[in-house]
Amino acid sequence: MAKADYNKRKPRKFGKGARRCIRCGQYGPIIRIQGLMLCRHCFREVAPKLGFRKYE
């Protein structure tokens, strides 16, 4: 095997590295409600525009 073969990675199918935020590209805490695919930071910024309300 050549050295170039070691640098290729197969795409992840599960885990934190499998999904990324469609707004900022961050991996990690992803909100997938109704297919949003937003990280929690972006979700907090965009949630009122999407119609989500915060109840006390």
Swiss-Prot record:
GO MF annotation terms: rRNA binding; structural constituent of ribosome; zinc ion binding
Keyword entries, A-Z: Metal-binding, Ribonucleoprotein, Ribosomal protein, RNA-binding, rRNA-binding, Zinc
A GO cellular component entry from the record: cytosolic small ribosomal subunit
Pfam families assigned to the protein according to its UniProt record, in alphabetical order: Ribosomal_S14 (PF00253)
Cofactor field: Zn(2+)
Record Gene3D superfamilies: 30s Ribosomal Protein S14, Chain N
Domain of life the protein comes from: Archaea
Co-factor note (free text): Binds 1 zinc ion per subunit.
Gene Ontology biological-process entries: cytoplasmic translation
Residues binding Zn(2+), per UniProt: 21, 24, 39, 42
Physiological role: Binds 16S rRNA, required for the assembly of 30S particles.
Subunit structure: Part of the 30S ribosomal subunit.
Family according to the record: Belongs to the universal ribosomal protein uS14 family. Zinc-binding uS14 subfamily.
Identification of the protein by name: Small ribosomal subunit protein uS14
